[in-house]
């Protein structure tokens, strides 16, 4: 990849298009090892579940993942209302000395973790009005994604399938519609299970992929993080290169048809 092909979010550019979560690892040391193997530059943190200073007597993620080396992306995992999400991100901004790039997710059901879009839209408006730069976990509905962009979201993050399901990309057509209409980055968020899922997302034209369970839940998280790094890079290169059209039959054989040696009679 060239240095010119960067992911730009809220005016800041990144070489890596892979965003990685920090939950579900054995400990903070394994978290850091996986992040290093992934090559990520943006690390998402569940404020309600991860200590970043709100519990001074416990180990802090920031001791292993310092803001000087990574862009931290506080998220609202576990929030089921706009009010809870807004309060959580206000706390994150206070703990991180005014940090304003955040990931909003407002869940609608504790079993499937599907986004509650009315509450998500409500929270997006409030956060944007308060000066946050909001990346939004959302459904793969193109209309809802357009509404989020109109409200001022700096990135839309449609799910590929349910959070933690590992089912991969179930609706590539909606993702294509969202990509084609959006003027902000589109990143797949949720559902990636293995490297090929990440590659497909990038081949579709997504600007990036965010994942946690696919790496942290793998038998070897460090090796999977490395695999995901290569998959995202390879998928992006394939998208830029441009795939050949799908055809039922080959209109032009790749083997030469001229200059063939005639069979002896």
Swiss-Prot record:
- Top-rank taxon of the source lineage equals Bacteria
Q: Which GO terms describe its cellular component?
A: cytoplasm
Could you name the active-site residues? 103 (schiff-base intermediate with dxp)
Q: What is the documented function of this protein?
A: Catalyzes the rearrangement of 1-deoxy-D-xylulose 5-phosphate (DXP) to produce the thiazole phosphate moiety of thiamine. Sulfur is provided by the thiocarboxylate moiety of the carrier protein ThiS. In vitro, sulfur can be provided by H(2)S.
Its annotated pathway? Cofactor biosynthesis; thiamine diphosphate biosynthesis
**Organism expressing this protein natively:** Bordetella pertussis (strain Tohama I / ATCC BAA-589 / NCTC 13251)
EC number(s) reported in the record: 2.8.1.10
What's a BP term from Gene Ontology annotated to this protein?
Answer: thiamine diphosphate biosynthetic process
The principal location of this protein is cytoplasm
What Pfam families would the database entry show?
A: ThiG
Q: What class of enzyme is it?
A: transferase
Which Gene Ontology terms cover its molecular function?
Answer: thiazole synthase activity
Recorded family membership: Belongs to the ThiG family.
Q: Where is 1-deoxy-D-xylulose 5-phosphate annotated to bind?
A: 164, 190-191, 212-213
| Protein name listed in UniProt | Thiazole synthase
């Amino acid at each position: 990849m060239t240095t010119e092909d960067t992911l730009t979010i809220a005016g800041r550019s990144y070489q890596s298009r892979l965003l990685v979560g920090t939950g579900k690892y054995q400990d903070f040391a394994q978290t850091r090892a996986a992040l290093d193997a992934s090559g990520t530059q943006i690390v998402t943190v569940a404020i309600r579940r991860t200590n970043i200073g709100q519990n001074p007597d416990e180990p802090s993620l920031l001791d292993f993942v310092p803001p000087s080396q990574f862009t931290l992306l506080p998220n609202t995992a576990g929030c089921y209302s706009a009010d809870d999400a807004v309060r959580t991100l206000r706390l994150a901004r206070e703990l991180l000395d005014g940090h304003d790039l955040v990931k909003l997710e407002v869940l609608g059901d504790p079993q499937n973790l599907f986004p509650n879009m009315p509450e998500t839209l409500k929270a997006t408006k409030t956060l944007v009005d308060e000066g946050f730069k909001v990346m939004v976990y959302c459904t793969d509905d193109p209309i809802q994604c357009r509404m989020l962009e109109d409200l001022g979201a700096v990135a839309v993050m449609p799910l590929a399938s349910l959070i933690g399901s590992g089912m991969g990309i179930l609706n590539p057509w909606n993702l294509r519609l969202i990509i084609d209409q959006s003027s902000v980055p589109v990143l797949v968020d949720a559902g990636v299970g293995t490297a090929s899922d990440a590659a497909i997302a990038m081949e579709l034209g997504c600007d990036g992929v965010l994942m946690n369970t696919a790496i942290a839940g793998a038998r070897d998280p460090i090796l999977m993080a490395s695999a995901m790094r290569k998959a995202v890079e390879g998928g992006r290169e394939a998208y830029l290169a441009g795939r050949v059209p799908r055809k039922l039959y080959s209109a032009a054989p790749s083997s030469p048809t001229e200059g063939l040696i005639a069979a002896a009679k």
